[in-house]
Structures are given as C-alpha cells and as structure tokens.
From Swiss-Prot:
Gene (name only): SUT2
Molecular-function GO terms, alphabetical: sucrose:proton symporter activity
Pathway(s) this gene product operates in, as recorded in its UniProt entry: Glycan biosynthesis; sucrose metabolism
One Pfam family this sequence matches: MFS_1
Assembly and binders: Homodimer.
Tissue: Widely expressed.
NCBIfam families, alphabetized: GPH_sucrose
Name this polypeptide is given: Sucrose transport protein SUT2
Superkingdom to which the source organism belongs: Eukaryota
Cited function: Responsible for the transport of sucrose into the cell, with the concomitant uptake of protons (symport system). May also transport other glucosides.
Amino acid sequence: MPRRPSGGGGGAGPAAAAVRKVPLRKLLRAASVACGVQFGWALQLSLLTPYVQELGIPHAFASLVWLCGPLSGLLVQPLVGHLSDRIAPAASPLGRRRPFIAAGAASIAAAVLTVGFSADLGRIFGDSITPGSTRLGAIIVYLVGFWLLDVGNNATQGPCRAFLADLTENDPRRTRIANAYFSLFMALGNILGYATGAYSGWYKIFPFTVTPSCSISCANLKSAFLLDIIILVVTTCITVASVQEPQSFGSDEADHPSTEQEAFLWELFGSFRYFTLPVWMVLIVTALTWIGWFPFILFDTDWMGREIYRGSPDDPSITQSYHDGVRMGSFGLMLNSVLLGFTSIVLEKLCRKWGAGLVWGVSNILMALCFVAMLVITYVAKNMDYPPSGVPPTGIVIASLVVFTILGAPLAITYSIPYAMAASRVENLGLGQGLAMGILNLAIVIPQVIVSLGSGPWDQLFGGGNAPAFAVAAAASFIGGLVAILGLPRARIASRRRGHR
C-alpha cells in the first residue's frame, strides 16, 4: 500500500488548498448531526437495557443483546467508510460522505419506530400482556429494531467523522476543533436525550402511546423515540446542507474508484502491517478505554435501579423502585453530558498546554477512580438498612450522581482525542479517512464484544449484580491511562499546526 506524499498531493496546488479551508462556523454546522444521532443513542443507553428486561430477558443475558452493536460496527462502519472513500466526489450531487450520513439517519428513524412499537407489534404476533410474562414476539421485533439502530448509528457517525476530517485537510489543530464540535453536539444530544428519558410524563403529552400492551413506562419510551425522529431529521438536514464537500483529496482513490481496488477485508486488515508504533499505541489505548466504558454504558441506569434503589424489572412488587432508579440514572447521565459539553469547549486548550497523550491518560485514570467509587457505593448501599420499596439514603444517591457527572469529562475526551489522533497519524499510510475511522472503530467494537460476552458469566460467577463488570472496567481504564501517559506524545501533536508526520 503506497504512502501518499506528506503535502496532501493529488495535484492540488496552494489555491485548491485555500479553497478547501472551510470556515469554523461551517464545520460547526457539519458536525450538528451528532446531536440527533446522540439523542437516540442516549435513549438507547439509558432506557433499553431496563426495557429489554421488562420484555422478559434475564439480567445475566441482557448484555448479549448489545452484541449486535459491536458486531454490526465491526463490519458496517469500516465498510461504509471504505465505500465512501471510493466514491468520486463528482459522482453524487451530495458528494461522497453525505449520502451515507443521510441513509444512516433514515435507518435510525426506522429503527427507533420499530423498537418503540415492539410491544404493540408483539401483541399482534400473539404475546400475552400479563405482567411478568415473557413476550417472545416483542423481543424478536425489538432485536430487529435494535440491530437496525446500531447499523444506522455506525453508518452515520463514521462518514460524519470522515466528512469532518476531509473538511479540515488533516490539519491537527482544525481536526481537533472539528472533533470537539462533534463532541459538543454529542453532549447536547446526550443532555436532551437523558432529560427526555428522565421525564416520566410523556405519556400524558402523547396519550395515544398508551395501549393494552404498552404500559406507562413503555409509552414514555415510545414518545421519546418519536421526539428523536424529529430532532434527527432537523440535524441531518443541517449537516447535509452545511458545506460543499471538497472536490479534490490527497489520494487518487476517489479519482479512480474502479481501478486497483483491493478486496475490502484484505485492505482493512492488510493495512495493519503499515502501522507505525504511535498508531498501534492509539489503537491499544482506545481498546483499553472502551473495555472501561462499555460496562458503564450497558449497566449505568440498571445499576442505579438495582444496586441503589433495590428494584427489579421482573418483580412487580419492586418494579416501581427500579423505574425510579432508572430515571434517576438518566438524570445523572444528563449531568454527565453537561460536563461533557463543557469539557469539549476547553479540550483544545488542554491539549495545547499538556499534550493530547497526557490529557487522554489522565482522563482514563479518572475513569478508573470513578468505577472504583461505584464499587464502594455498591458495597455501602448493600450494607445499609433500607427497604427495597423505599427511597435510598440521600447521601448514596448524591454520591452516585456525583460519579455519573464526573465521568462526563473523560467521556468528552474519549469522543474526541482518539479520532483526532487517528486522523492525523493514519493519513500518511495511503488510507482514506473513511477507512481510517473504520480501523479505529475496530479498536472500539472488539472490546465491546469481549465485554458483552463476559458480563453474563461474570454476573453469575460472582453472585449477580453489576459490580464484576465495573471492576474489569476500572482495571482496564487504569492500564489504558498508564499506556497513554507513557506511550503517547505529550506535546508534539498539540504544538503542530500544519503538515503531517
């Protein structure tokens, strides 16, 4: 695989480069689709693990449902990135990235409708509406929608990241700013999504969502997904109309899409042999970081409902306590997103001052401390005397919310720095930005597969609950932090304004 010239090449002279320098305000609009995508993702993270347990899947197997996310991401995001790299910019009136962004958004809209109405569709397929019964039809419909939702998420976010990388022309500073904009919109989508999930009165605003097969909690979820579609359509239109895609790139891939194309998987995995040590370090730290994040993503609100509020989604006598905990967890995730947004604003200054590697490493160690704090809170709550149907002590709830909030800072860094570092370091390998984002995605989804497969056995091995997964998360985050501090550059990537390695 040939290296491309460090100047960007492709016959584009200085004038073309000047034309391609997109104003920051247009980069801001180009990143806005992250708000719509993340709104639905926030609902997925906060509400769907509890909801699938309501449908009848046991807690020990709930993590297996999330396998569809990393498995679809394992192929969908690299494939979409590869295909968008190969499209000649002039071949489509929307360029080469925006058609995939629009198609992914349409998939998300179809998916959330399927998930939201899964209980009603399950009733059509013969499900019982008796409380506590397993609804096989609804589970099947839910799984189809869940898979489609993850495919849509991967098909949208990958091309959007590559779109931003194209617009910034691999300038490290502008790339970090563009990814910070993306993180800022993700934070806004998170805030809106988690606030929507924390509100329990949507069924009153949309009374048609309550049906014999869809209880109040189900109707609230259904209403939230209807709001998601509105926000997704608006933000997708803003992104697609924001800026014209560059007509010239640093590689001749797009100019000759029908020649010299290697088989996709061979190109994806074969590119590994060209990676330098710094690229491998970025991928290793990314993998360890996501081994840390995924247990929290899977079980954050479930942890609040089970361990803190002592409820259960499959025991009618304490179901209300569980839902109260889930809503409180959604509120905590909303606070998390506020800090995420603030961190996204100041992240560029932090990287300039301390270096991207050090900032990333310190954030991972902070993650580890937060997960250890969750284990301590779990232990303290378990040994306190309050009834399952009662309200947990205020101190325990506040401590849990503080941990949820603090985790917003490292989450903002996870959403930004790995992508910026990958974009600036992989460019000279002869890869398009779409495939580069797909390769980074492998370092995200493979750890998610490991956690999804391991969470159930860890749960059963240690007597149930979410503590074992959080212990693994703490260890992986701490190791990832040390590797980032010792193995990634501190100042070099932050001090360079232009050019390539």
